[in-house]
């Protein structure tokens, strides 16, 4: 053994020499093919897609896309020459595949002349790096295609969140004839050559950053470069994609001891530092910037950041992240610098220090050559620049100032006024009175009660301090003591009637409590209706008990003019409890299953809600309890606005025709030509802007589907986002459609899928609930207002919370006053959307509730509470199956144009002829509705004008009813003996019918009438 070692060493050196010689030759070919992009000043969004040849074989984008179904996105073009009568040819494919589980996918050989599949195929050697295959050249000489990632193309739409992980790849099959195999084994095989590797379209291309280096190439670099980590500075034009391997570009170019970038004035310039933990894991990686200097001119290091290690969160708070890189893994560190608009042109030099635990500091000199040209938008319009990464740290709209229609707050003694809401506080800091619209919500002051071994303890006396922090924020702080227990209460009261409470409860020593109870008593009026904590919604039951089982953390008690929404807080996630986001309940309130909430009291009497923790232990350090209140309605219902805005919800090509029937607002959904991918409406720009400009000529508005919950794989910054290690992209098992498997590889969670034209697809990823992507999303909204002149957005079940909605509305008022937000939800997905989204309602213009709303099964009180939006200050439209056009008008609701079996246009025509925009809406739910019916299942809503009245009748029962109407003629301003009651003809709704005052009116089950009452002519 000792004698053999020198021979082994010599052999290894020989191998290394040969490998390096091959690599050098490949580098020359690589440089030859990419000479047009060798100068960094010319790098752009096309650079990474230029042909390259890491093994002397070019990787290119095909000049014509082939059919993806059964073939896939990648192929090798193989040339067979001089086959003569050979029954088998052999070809080596250095494909450098990044996908996992390559041996689980079929290798498909297709005859280029006949397009027929070659069945006699034998795989001799196979790995991620390369394969050696033998196949029968059935047409002898010619071109053959080897599809090495074939899959079944998925049609239509689907959702990868549910069920087993998707695997659309074709599995390996052995169809080769045994006699043919025997001939191959006898060696009757000739060589074929690989002309090139092709990607079906540019988006599918692996790029030099997506193909793996071989193990030998990695070992070579490890032998040459002994430092750990090995560092690869990289321009933003070549996003770092891989994490399990280094890319072929790095294997060819090797690491660099410096970085040179090229920027324009006012550009937000980004670049990357690739960290390869080649020899050992790297812990706590930190980048330290220096100033950039050009003589006396300086760009301060304060203008630089590394997005992976620091930033400003969605709530405006600064944070730092710890970056660790496991052994043999790759981590991209994305960096950015704001180039001042007035900076002198020239070359600015500085350095980056790379710190990590247990490793020497590495210093990378950097220089950025700055051109005199000014980039007006900082680079936001050129997605490839990744300038928008700075949006991740934006604080846009984050302040404590009121936004329309809300006003500045005032405070006098213990009374706080938030626009039309008045809150009075007890000495202990809890509300003693909440009034809105002349209605009192609380029958008694709210209070906290401790049940101890020695009886009950309440907190009444304290030192209350109320401070106006800003025009839109008032805080109230109180400390109460009783029998040795201390209660510290801090309330943040905002301009829209939102109140956030933080309570800290302490004992002088560790003390066992029987219970901690928060008690609220609501007036009879303000507790008629109820929803939340496991109750779907409607008239309040005499008693409802909830023990924290199920995805709920809030409830609402109220009526049309006064109500209160209550949310238990204490966890990290405070957005709507969607199927994607079901955090554990707040620990202090749920108390390991011992907590419960009880709502009790006979209908039309006071209602008491008691949140009880059950037995718990109190310590000198204290227990924390949090909750939110929101006074409803958040704002007055604007019926004029509602009836003057009529929605079309279908492909944009039909909008002009729908406008002839009254539609004046379009929502452009995703998966449409002008908005093809989900939640990233930045790819199609020119045609979208042209469409918006066209509609503006006719005073029509254009809104886009734009939300947060999932994000398309077409996002330009997707690899930068993945480098943030689940801050933004949720963790998961991977899989999903082939593109995700081939480019993101693993460690992501697939979501919504939509087929796009030409066998392409939009494959979304689930996002983490709260992250800096919210900041990006809001800046994207601002950008669309400024660049598209967009008129608003359509939100579909989102995962952010009320503070984000505040920021959104402030952005609207600053950059596009009058822009609109409408919210759609799926009651099977968000489990009671009206309750889940109550905190959004001060800032929403309209609801579209919604999917899985089964209108014909809902009682009137369910319609009112869960659908109408009216108790919260807005109105809604019907979605599921077009809703019920008869019952909907009781709440002022129709379906949207082109969404449902019946057009709303005939009802819109009646609105127009009657002038409903200027009418006062008085629903059956109001105490003074001037038209009543004789049957509890038949409801009447009045649209009152000075000289005439429109009455919407709806029979919510399951059988036909005959009813009489009882009129308050004085309030209607009409005389009974001088009026006529007419049901005008409305297509698909009713035929013309005349009724006399006092006459019985038949109303079919689940149908109704639209009656106009006016003086006889």
Name the predicted role of every residue range.
Residues 704, 708-783, 788:
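Active-site-adjacent "subsite" loops/lids of carbohydrate-active enzymes
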